[in-house]
Amino acid sequence: MKNNIRELRQGAGLSQAALAKDLGVSRQTVNSIETGRYAPSLPLAITMARYFRRTVEEIFHVDE
């Protein structure tokens, strides 16, 4: 699953560690989501979307 998390995080001036702390997850989780190695749970995807004031669909894209 592709996503825009890295671009949104960098645009907000946040480190992976800072975003992880705000979301209540590990830095490794943020890294894994950004690189597409891990698809977040629906609750985490919704939390991330709300954090960046976007819809889930604006952030996460299914590989086609």
Predicted regions and their residues:
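Short basic helix-loop element that most often maps to the first helix and adjoining turn
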Residues: N3-D22
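DNA major-groove recognition helix of helix-turn-helix/homeodomain DNA-binding modules
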Residues: P43-E58
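Key DNA-contact positions within bacterial/archaeal DNA-binding proteins
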Residues: A17, Q28, E57
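Short amphipathic recognition helices of helix-turn-helix/homeodomain-type DNA-binding modules
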Residues: E58-E64
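Recognition helix of helix-turn-helix/homeodomain-like DNA-binding domains
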Residues: V25-Y38
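Short amphipathic helical patch at the helix-1/turn junction of helix-turn-helix
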Residues: Q10, Y38-A39
